[in-house]
Amino acid sequence: MGLFGKTQEKPPKELVNEWSLKIRKEMRVVDRQIRDIQREEEKVKRSVKDAAKKGQKDVCVVLAKEMIRSRKAVSKLYASKAHMNSVLMGMKNQLAVLRVAGSLQKSTEVMKAMQSLVKIPEIRATMRELSKEMMKAGIIEEMLEDTFESMDDQEEMEEAAEMEIDRILFEITAGALGKAPSKVTDALPEPEPSGAMAASDEEEEEEEALEAMQSRLATLRS
């Protein structure tokens, strides 16, 4: 605390170093998120192969859509890392300018990167806080409120393109999925009454496993 109870402003160099540390910390968070999604995707691939062997093309299609969503999420996370690297480079430039001019300077590159980063759900809280600190320090201009509020992914896939689904399934099953029926029941013989209950129980367990996998992926992407 300074005189009259006012908080003393931190030196510009200290601010820049703090921002850089926070950015690097968030990059580690993003790296961890990417690894988690990719690990879950490997489980989905195994499930697709199992479902394809059983002739459950409808299950395969659902899982393929989850994989498409996950890959899009990973792609966006990699893009966010690129933006964070841009901010880190901007911080290095600020330190260089500080040594020469004695003060921080406005940066359009940092501004553009931060505008993208505040929209990423996984890191939005920290990026929003950093943006406000950078605005106060004069590095970036005040962001419009709708920049902060437009957090929802407008490009969320409602229905994956059939071509993309086919490509994913072909990739995982090495082209064998074309032999699978369009519905699970197409591949099933007429069951004996005693076996019907067992088949029903197995399908119910598989459905629960599918829902659990979808839930885990959705949680990782949120």
From Swiss-Prot:
Numbered residues of crosslink Glycyl lysine isopeptide (Lys-Gly) (interchain with G-Cter in ubiquitin): 179
Gene giving rise to this polypeptide: CHMP3
Recorded superkingdom: Eukaryota
UniProt keyword annotation of tRNA processing present: no
Assembly notes: Probable core component of the endosomal sorting required for transport complex III (ESCRT-III). ESCRT-III components are thought to multimerize to form a flat lattice on the perimeter membrane of the endosome. Several assembly forms of ESCRT-III may exist that interact and act sequentially. Forms a metastable monomer in solution; its core structure (without part of the putative autoinhibitory C-terminal acidic region) oligomerizes into a flat lattice via two different dimerization interfaces.
Coiled-coil segments on the chain, per record: 22-54, 149-222
UniProt-annotated stretches for the region Disordered: 180-222
Species name: Macaca fascicularis
Region of interest called Intramolecular interaction with N-terminus, as start-end residue ranges on this chain: 151-220
Subcellular location: Cytoplasm, Cytosol; Membrane; Endosome; Late endosome membrane
UniProt site (Important for autoinhibitory function): 48
Marked site (Interaction with STAMBP) residue numbers: 216
Residue ranges, annotated region (Intramolecular interaction with C-terminus): 2-113
Listed name of the protein: Charged multivesicular body protein 3
